[in-house]
Design a protein with these regions (language model features):
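Zinc-dependent deaminase catalytic domain
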Residues: 1-160
């Protein structure tokens, strides 16, 4: 069987598909999110949303946000979990890997808390798949000069179906 070069995913779709696989490790009951930090077409770190290392997962003890009736997008601190983007930056730091100038691929648009961390970590470009409307995050990212793009999978998926 011969594959056509035309059917290969471009780099953005390639790394976003990896972020999708990473999201399958998420332990959040509300939403599974995956993140991949890339520089020069090399993966530097990955992260998914879930509780901190060594702590019980929400699937085991329940969702604190649901228990407290916290609406989506509000009071991010009222959660046992850490976001995928935060986890990816932490993993890079733990292993002594600079993410300055890198691109973050994330299955969801970053919230304001993650946006601030990404700006300070030196991430220069964010590519996301699913929107997560957060006006303050969008304003901060724009003011920082961050390049932010939503990746459209529809066109790419059509070409990949015929492999």
């Amino acid at each position: 069987m011969t594959r056509s070069v035309e059917n290969r995913p471009d780099w953005d779709h390639y790394f976003m598909e990896i972020a999708e696989v990473v999201s399958k490790r998420a332990t959040c009951l509300r939403r599974g999110v995956g993140a991949v930090i890339v520089k020069n077409k090399q993966i530097l770190a990955t992260g998914y949303n879930g509780t901190p290392k060594g702590m019980p997962h929400c699937a085991e003890v329940g969702c604190l946000r649901e228990q407290l009736n916290v609406p989506s997008g509000k009071c991010h601190e009222l959660c046992r979990g850490i976001h995928a983007e935060q986890n990816a930056v932490v993993q890079a730091a733990v292993h002594g890997v600079s993410v300055d100038g890198a691109t973050l691929y994330c299955t969801n648009q970053p919230c304001v808390v993650c946006s601030k961390i990404l700006i300070n970590a030196g991430i220069r470009r964010i590519v996301y798949r699913d929107p997560y409307p957060d006006k303050l995050a969008e304003e901060m990212l724009a003011a920082s000069g961050m390049q932010v793009e939503r990746l459209d999978f529809a066109e790419q998926e059509l070409s990949l179906i015929h492999i």
